[in-house]
């Protein structure tokens, strides 16, 4: 089946197409997806620009109703959307359905935000003068989304953009575009006017670059790699006029396990954070920093649990770990496994798994005897690969945890209130978890990090308004 870009409510074909392959079964082609060029991208931007004046002038009630209908439709189709997501990206079916549910919840939340826009009215320091502070839409917003959450991340960017009256050009990841395509179709069914949301399928180096350079695009929100994010930021500041930019770029997240931790709880937090979703989460626990008193018991228990995980076809109900997303990521993961061994760490697991279908199946890999200077502890792998770093005590654990170029998520397992509070205060990450996996954030709270992980305003929750709206201060002489 062929899938085209969607511009101004119409399907727009491209001369080139890319195959979307099921990573659980390489013989299963999900579809042939358009590979748009710069001209098609510019067409989408012009459609969004033309739709902006009328959409930004709509009432909060109208925007609420459309977003709420979209939420209802998504939640009614969780089974279908979850299965489509798992088929193209490789998440287990339970994870795929959970992500589709999250997308519906996000739209419901931002439907409510349409009615909570608010503002301020203040007296001036000058007599007889009033001050009104309001928020306004930016204009055309370019959204560039990754493959690892192919419906949730488009949802948490699209929903606030529309709630605040912006129009959108969405460019989903080329290797997992089907979920975004289905989401755009649902929004049209919910009554979103033509041109307000436009979907451009294609390569980031073509579509993304056109979005960054076009003068009618007011802002870019990007989730992806650090290197690409930096190029986008440079392009947005070099463009005329300059663009507002928001970047989410990954992590190398620590989970600290102290001697006083509940061992079973700590192991389950590490197992979930490091290996679920095949480790393909920017919030994954890729560095397990463990004090020496509990180290051996923790490693033994975690090794036992991880090697018992069922690796297989994403749509098989028995599967706990699905395939790696594609050949390129599969080779990256195997390369880091070889590199960790070469660096002197001891490998547990990490074998290629043969299944009934040909796919990118990899057993979770755990490195012990690692140190924080190794590449496997410094660089984001984005696969089911984690390392254990032994430390003496809480102070040395904090030093290692914060010794990273990233700062997205962090966690600690402890029964000590003293250490839990100290960790939350001293963690160099934007999110800190106590006795929980580092992966897993509610949809109504801010998401984002520090250092090389994030740049610009936070995503999600009420904090999303800071990116998707502009503040205006108006004075009136009475």
Task: Tell where the protein language model's regions lie, with residue ranges.
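Hydrophobic face of amphipathic alpha-helices that form TPR/SEL1-like repeat modules
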Residues: 1-25
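Residue-level signal for inorganic ion chemistry
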Residues: 9, 27, 63, 85, ...
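Glycine-rich loop-to-alpha-helix module at the N-terminal edge of alpha/beta enzyme cores
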Residues: 27-118, 128
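Conserved C-terminal structural/oligomerization subdomain of aldehyde/semialdehyde dehydrogenase
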Residues: 28-31, 217, 310, 337, ...
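Short, well-ordered beta-strand elements within core beta-sheets of diverse protein domains
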Residues: 30-36, 51-57, 143, 255-258, ...
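Rossmann-like NAD(P) dinucleotide-binding subdomain of oxidoreductase/dehydrogenase enzymes
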Residues: 119-265, 391
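A short hydrophobic/small-residue beta-strand
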Residues: 167-169, 347, 431
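ALDH superfamily catalytic-core signature
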Residues: 219, 227-371, 434
